[in-house]
Amino acid sequence: MDKSESTSAGRNRRRRPRRGSRSAPSSADANFRVLSQQLSRLNKTLAAGRPTINHPTFVGSERCRPGYTFTSITLKPPKIDRGSYYGKRLLLPDSVTEYDKKLVSRIQIRVNPLPKFDSTVWVTVRKVPASSDLSVAAISAMFADGASPVLVYQYAASGVQANNKLLYDLSAMRADIGDMRKYAVLVYSKDDALETDELVLHVDIEHQRIPTSGVLPV
């Protein structure tokens, strides 16, 4: 063997991969795949807990529909005797109602108990005739006819029942801001008297943007 052949053979020996070196990338790839799967599961778990349209923030992550914002109303029912009812029409601020032709897409009711809450209440929102005086008899009939979904909110030791929200989609009805005065929040105190300081209802009304919406949540 001459010198050139010896040099070439040496180079070939140096280029030969060491034992086990081919399996290293496969092992790393497998570990990467496992890690990716774990991250994917973690992301799904986190996504499930992120604020959505049903979350108290209402527009926390998904935000309102394009071109929409929302206005919130807070209602504090007065004392309601056991087995009795309360009703309140949706009255938006004048700065919003002057744009009465802007469409409303969704209404969400959130029930927030105060520390003294230990009752069971039924909550709903209904379109009611302008002539209705929201008397006990009228509200009772609306709860009984089954024409609207009802949120049953019960006392929870944790302070907040897991399901404390009710969402109404009005998109198909082409309802507008002017129609909101035709809707009312209704409450039925089923098992116990509801005291004035026991419950707060937050009503979020998602509607098309208006010129004053720069001061509203986005």
Curated annotation (Swiss-Prot):
Keywords: Capsid protein, T=3 icosahedral capsid protein, Virion. It is found in: Virion. One of its GO terms (cellular component) is T=3 icosahedral viral capsid. Pfam families: Cucumo_coat. Residues 1-28 are annotated as: Disordered. The keyword Ubl conjugation does not apply. Its main location: virion. Residues 11-21 have a biased composition (Basic residues). InterPro entries: Cucumovirus_coat, Cucumovirus_coat_Asu_sf. One of its GO terms (molecular function) is structural molecule activity. The N-terminal arginine-rich stretch does not seem to be the major RNA-binding region that allows formation of an infectious ribonucleoprotein complex. Capsid protein. Probably binds RNA and plays a role in packaging. Belongs to the cucumovirus capsid protein family. This is Capsid protein. It comes from Cucumber mosaic virus (strain FNY) (CMV).
